[in-house]
Amino acid sequence: DAEGTKTLLHKLADRGVNYIDTARGYTVSEEYLGYALEGIRDRFIIATKSMARTKEAMAEDIEKSLHNLRTDHIELYQVHNPSMEQLDQVQAAGGALEALQEARATGKIEHIGLTAHSVEVFCPGSGA
């Protein structure tokens, strides 16, 4: 719950933990973390991710993440687990990458990342 998350984050911060990885799709994770980070946000690096593939959907998810996490910036925002076809969509005109680049240009995010469950996404044609 939110109170348990707050207690845990404060204990972790006191022990030197400073990195949080979450995602839009992790049910209430961003909301609980946003509540828990009040007053200690500057002690953490936040990474989150989205399954959005279009510019419009990604821009919406970035705004939702900022709102839920109760912050004005996110250090790392990632495209989460695209297939090869989806990766093409993400990079094409009107794709999610455009929204991420715009968010970085305005200071809403610092870094753009990619997560994958397949080596093929990172090394196309490698046979790995």
Regions found by a protein language model. Name each.
Residues E3, H10, D14, K55-A128:
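Glycine/proline-rich, positively charged
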Residues R41-I45, Y77-H80:
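Short, basic/glycine-rich phosphate-binding loops at helix/coil junctions
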Residues I40-D42, T48-K49, D61, G94:
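Short alpha-helix boundary/capping motifs
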Residues D21, K49, E75:
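Acidic active-site catalytic centers that drive phospho-/nucleotidyl reactions
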Residues R24-V28, S50-R53, A116-S118:
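Short beta->alpha linker loops
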Residues D1-F44, A59, A105:
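N-terminal binding-site loop/beta-alpha segment at the start of enzyme catalytic domains
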Residues I20, I45-A47, E110-T115:
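Structural detector of well-ordered beta-strand residues that form the stable sheet scaffold
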